[in-house]
Amino acid sequence: MSTPSRLAVGICFMAVAACAGPSTRETPNLGRLATPSEVAAWDVSVGPDGTGLPPGRGTSGQGAIVYVQKCQNCHGERGAGQPNDRLVGGHETLATARPVRTVGSYWPYATTLFDYVRRAMPYTQSHSLSDDEVYAVTAYLLHLNGIIGESDAMSAETLPKVKMPNRDNFILAYPTRPK
């Protein structure tokens, strides 16, 4: 392309850009900023150390009742799976070609179980369980996996103290840097 042609193309681009100006067309109004109270309602993150755990308490016995009512249809009797993921067992499979990654065999922190159940379960009605029900279901699943006793109560104080069997088998991708 010759220099005069380049100049003509450049002038055309600049003219189009100058004529465009700010748009007076309205946006499609596809949303709005969330209010602080709306953000707070969904700010339910729980850390491995228990940061963010709400008040509440639940036992395995209480959790068994909730599990049968709200979880068993998807996760099977006593967490055995079918039609969805197994929640119990798999302890001897992690080093095999087909590991069974369950709450008891794979998950590194008990607080992660609470956090996930609270946010996402039951699948068809997430955020529908009370905090006491979530603690109870968490206790039930930990008991089924042989991690806590049947009468152990889970709460914001006790749950972070539960040592999961696979906790020490994870390699941190971004280890904490010394200060």
Task: Give the ranges of each region predicted by the language model.
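N-terminal Sec signal peptide cleavage junction
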Residues: 19-22
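Bacterial N-terminal signal peptides that target proteins for export
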Residues: 1-9
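Flexible coil segments in periplasmic/lumen-exposed cytochrome c-class electron-transfer proteins
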Residues: 124-179
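Bacterial N-terminal signal peptides
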Residues: 9-17
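Electrostatic cytochrome c docking/interface patches
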Residues: 29-66, 122-125
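Gly/Gly-Pro-rich "capping" loops immediately C-terminal to redox-active cysteine motifs
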Residues: 64, 80-118, 122
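The canonical Cys-X-X-Cys-His
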Residues: 63, 67-78, 87, 137-141
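Sequence context surrounding c-type heme c attachment/ligation sites in exported
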Residues: 61-69, 80-84, 107-110, 128-131, ...
